[in-house]
Amino acid sequence: IILMGGRTGRDGIGGATGSSKVHTEESIEVCGAEVQKGNAPTERKLQRLFRRPEVSRLIKKCNDFGAGGVSVAIGELADGLQIDLDKVPKKYAGLDGTEIAISESQERMALVVDPKDVDKMLAYAAEENLEAVPVAVVTESPRLVLNWRGKTIVDLSRAFLDTNGAHQETTVTVEVPTREGNVFDKQEVKDVKEKWLSMLSSLNVCSQKGLVEMFDS
């Protein structure tokens, strides 16, 4: 399995769970690292490479890197995997095994190719000025194994991963809404201008320019 494209950093760590949390105006001060940093030039190189027929024919299976990083993007590709986190290209030193495994740094792809085609795929990547490194191998044992600095830091059975977690049940009570304040009970608009300005002042309707400039869009 070849990791191709951008390098791995701390950006995006916790993004998968962070997107489901309640955020406030102070979130930008404490949750900035959960947002990935885009890399348009590298993305364009990947697109150009994948459009080449001689390249796409060598790919048995592939995944882009999103929520969960290496542990998910590579972890989904086969039932049995040995992943060497030391081989993952990094943006800077100091990352530990957990950070490398779950970082959601963007513009990365994981490709499954036949062992005899690895050198050929690496050569094609070099032609597009893309960094590409073999970081994992598919194994017969149905386990996801992550190694870092000579130690096994993750060793999970595929049967456990396929259960989607522990079974949970909860009791839910839905209260009947009162007539007053019912969102489905629409009132006749008496002042169009006032209603219009009220809508435009809503955070869900107003211009999102500030957010687009602040985060990865």
In which residue ranges do the predicted regions lie?
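Glycine/proline-enriched, intrinsically flexible loops and inter-domain linkers
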Residues: 1-217
